[in-house]
């Protein structure tokens, strides 16, 4: 939606303070409908591109759904394609290329010819990749169909469809990375940690070579420095966080899954009652700490193991009593300066448990600001599924996070609390948000499916509901 007063030469203007566009949405015109939100709100701003005609994560998913070819299977080096076109032979319009990735890094690329594939028919294509696949790394193969010739709407070589499959040393049928269950499967164990060196414990402070970690009395990780560099914002270590605000979530559920949206204060979703279960104590050469957060019926625990070399091992255990819970995970704030981001997960656009088929597993480089999504109505954003490894860099110090099990993450310079506003009558815009220097990070076991119904609630499918129990 454009406000014509904020357009110059056909382009939307930007706010000089934030650099963000002056986009408006249906929420800005509620008064024109006598104060009733019907057919205003996000009915007026929920397209698959932005008002400035820019690409979005939604468009990535829609492109996957509407493609005219199916990658049926990949087994024993044979790719099976199905032509979904009504009149066109695949061989007439597409070239096929493939790329092998080892832990997200490209190790082999090539191109093969597509045989004649009539409409509605399938074909088998031998893929002669030469990479030796072993159990020491994660291997996937990415297939891409690109245009043979330029068209009136696209250049030659434009990628029209893509699909990834996991490779294994056993040469069994490759699991499709597009399958939502892919990120729910175990992707490997954390490596063993060497225990060389010594640690000192005084009160709730653990000190090792070049680093220091302090816990508050309630179990909060209050301070973490490495070579005099602050890694975590003071008193903002890992804490339970179940908050999510998406404008078209079910109005009657709100962000927590149990409070009317226009009355939702969110305190219960943001944290709970904290406690130190086990104060810092030496265990061999290491130090162990256990903390917990109780939120209503649910208790969430973090068991820390701190090693002499500075590695911190966190085992997060959660308990959830409602499938309507919006998120199960932890939030924390990294210190200012760690702007450079490298992550091994599904990307490069944001993706969710029920909207990730168009996203590819890979090693991506970006910045925290680069992960911000300029949505017409500010809301929870930026999730990436299947996190394996994340590295934050402030140009002098690198902080690396490696995961085991199912983890999704997001990074932002904007506090989630800013999304806790009256969506329908608040009229907030991205340029209204206050940017902080620190980095707000989320690491989630599960985020409830976004759903896909424009009226009467989100209609989240059963398999994407938040699992209950421990």
Residues covered by each model-derived region:
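Extended substrate-binding grooves/exosites of carbohydrate-active enzymes
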Residues: 1-76, 84-92, 97-106
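Surface beta-strand/loop "capping" patches
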Residues: 55-94, 179-208, 316
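Hydrophobic beta-strand positions in extracellular immunoglobulin-like domains
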Residues: 81-85, 100, 129, 145, ...
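Short, hydrophobic/aromatic beta-strand segments
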Residues: 88-96, 110, 154-155, 323-329
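Short beta-strand and strand-turn-strand segments in soluble, beta-rich domains
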Residues: 92, 100-112, 158-159, 457-460
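Intrinsically disordered, low-complexity Pro/Gly/Ser/Thr-rich segments with frequent PxxP/GP/PP motifs
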Residues: 99, 103-153
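Beta-strand/loop-rich accessory regions of lumenal/periplasmic or secreted enzymes
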Residues: 128-136, 149-151, 168-470
């Amino acid at each position: 939606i454009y406000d014509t007063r904020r357009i110059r030469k056909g382009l939307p203007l930007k706010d000089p303070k934030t650099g963000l566009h002056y986009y408006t949405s249906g929420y800005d015109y509620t008064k024109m409908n006598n104060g009733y939100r019907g057919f205003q709100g996000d009915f007026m701003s929920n397209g698959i591109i932005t008002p400035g005609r820019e690409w979005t994560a939604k468009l990535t998913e829609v492109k996957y759904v509407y493609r005219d070819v199916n990658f049926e299977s990949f087994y024993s080096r044979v790719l099976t394609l199905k032509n979904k076109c009504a009149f066109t032979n695949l061989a007439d319009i597409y070239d096929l290329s493939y790329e092998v990735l080892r832990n997200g890094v490209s190790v082999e690329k090539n191109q093969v010819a597509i045989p004649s594939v009539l409409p509605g028919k399938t074909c088998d294509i031998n893929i002669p990749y030469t990479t030796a696949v072993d159990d020491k790394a994660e291997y996937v193969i990415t297939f891409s169909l690109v245009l043979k010739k330029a068209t009136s709407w696209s250049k030659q070589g434009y990628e029209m469809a893509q699909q990834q499959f996991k490779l294994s040393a056993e040469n069994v049928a490759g699991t499709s990375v597009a399958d939502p269950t892919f990120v729910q499967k175990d992707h490997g164990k954390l490596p063993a940690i060497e225990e060389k060196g010594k640690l000192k414990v005084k009160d709730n402070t653990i000190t090792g070579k070049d680093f220091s970690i302090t816990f508050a009395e309630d179990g909060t990780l209050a301070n973490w420095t490495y070579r005099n560099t602050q890694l975590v914002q003071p008193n903002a270590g890992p804490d339970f966080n179940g908050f999510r605000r998406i404008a078209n979530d079910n109005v009657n559920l709100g962000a927590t899954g149990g409070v009317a949206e226009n009355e939702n204060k969110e305190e219960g979703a943001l944290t709970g009652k904290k406690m130190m279960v086990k104060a810092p104590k030496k265990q061999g050469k290491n130090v162990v700490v256990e903390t917990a957060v109780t939120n209503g019926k649910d208790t969430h625990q973090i068991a820390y193991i701190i090693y002499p070399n500075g590695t911190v091992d966190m085992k997060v255990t959660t308990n959830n009593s409602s499938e309507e819970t919006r998120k199960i995970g932890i939030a924390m704030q990294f210190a200012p300066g760690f702007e450079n981001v490298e992550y091994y997960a599904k990307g490069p656009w944001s993706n969710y448990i029920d909207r990730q088929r168009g996203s590819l597993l890979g090693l991506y480089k970006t910045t925290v600001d680069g992960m911000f999504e300029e949505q017409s109505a500010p809301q929870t954003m930026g999730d990436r599924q299947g996190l394996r490894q994340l590295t934050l860099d402030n140009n002098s110090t690198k902080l690396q996070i490696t995961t085991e099990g199912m983890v999704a993450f997001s990074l932002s310079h904007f506090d989630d609390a800013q999304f806790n506003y009256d969506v329908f009558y608040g009229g907030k815009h991205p340029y209204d948000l206050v940017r902080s220097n620190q980095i707000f990070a989320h690491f989630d076991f599960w985020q409830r499916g976004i759903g896909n119904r424009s009226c009467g609630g989100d209609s989240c499918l059963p398999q994407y509901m938040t699992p209950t129990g421990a």
